[in-house]
Amino acid sequence: MNIAVAQFEPKDGDTSYNLSVIEKLTKKAKSKGADLISFHEMAITAYTFTKDLNLKELTELAETVPAGKSTQELIRISKSLDMPILAGLVEKEQGKIFNTYICVTKEGVIAKFRKLHPFINKHLTPGNEYCVFDLLGWKCGILICYDNNVIENVRATALLGAELIFAPHVTGCTPSKMPGRDYVDGTYWENRFKDPVSLRLQFDGPKGRRWLMRWLPARAYDNGVYYAFTNPIGYDGEHLKNGNSMIIDPYGEVLSEIKSFEDDITISKVTKDKIKWSGGWRYKNARRPELYRTILGKEHSSDTTPIWLTSNED
């Protein structure tokens, strides 16, 4: 199977524009032989700007799934190109609002996952279910951004049978207590055509890609799964994001990665033979859950708030 991952610079709240870019990149992926395409977290609506929305504004941005206009448009695009598409949006249902990621085909919505650890807006409700579904002969899972940082989520999704995990993100280039993490100054982006090397050093350094590579390949390797990582490029809200959408195999190797500063895609062929030959597959079979069943099940109060969203830093 040939899978495509995308990156693009979204416009805040402009679902028509964002869907037009999704259609353009899906056409590009189709023309280059991809069997499906995956976009980033809340690609249909944009993400970071929602941190400042009140309940009324967030509710107005949200749509129902599958009846909402954006989902129906995504289905139309998928049907016209005969290609599954995965993308994120803000969903509303029965008075609750979710950070949601969907997979659509010409038949309609075949999978829906709600972010387990939303933090960008206090009015978002966490999802409470994992998602593993069949797509083109593969068992696929979805974990949105921060969900992937909680390693139990990845292991649980793999244990439910996932062979390929879609990992839509809006991440990188934000401050942290970790040395080297910070925002990227906007002048680098403004000068990206005159001085692309300086911007690439910012995006690929500890603020962006180097941070990703500390943990992202390990999620694939430890669990013996493929990872389809997606991330916007350029501005999402007031923050620059480094893109670097990539496909990682069960050995933890990057198969392909987007290195441009443009709206773009990359495609890789994934094969099932690597899964059962991987270390992660063997490690899952070697588990002794009787040793840690009660440890993992202990009561715990979850705190998801990242440092860059806290108002009182030390």
Predicted feature residues:
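Active-site-proximal beta-strand elements of phosphoester/diester hydrolases
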Residues: 1-12, 100, 112-115, 132, ...
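Active-site beta-strand/loop signature of hydrolases that rely on acidic residues for catalysis
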Residues: 3, 18, 26-56, 78, ...
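A charged helix-plus-loop insertion that forms the helical arch/lid used to bind
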Residues: 52-67
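CN hydrolase (nitrilase-like) catalytic-core segments centered on the catalytic cysteine
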Residues: 66-84, 139, 149-265
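Short beta-strand scaffold segments in enzyme catalytic cores
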Residues: 87-89, 100-103, 131, 245-247, ...
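Hydrophobic "anchor" residues
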Residues: 109-110, 254
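A short, polar/charged loop-to-alpha-helix boundary motif
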Residues: 115-129, 262-280
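Cysteine/selenocysteine-centered motifs that mediate thiol-based redox chemistry or coordinate metal-sulfur cofactors
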Residues: 141-163, 167-169, 274-314
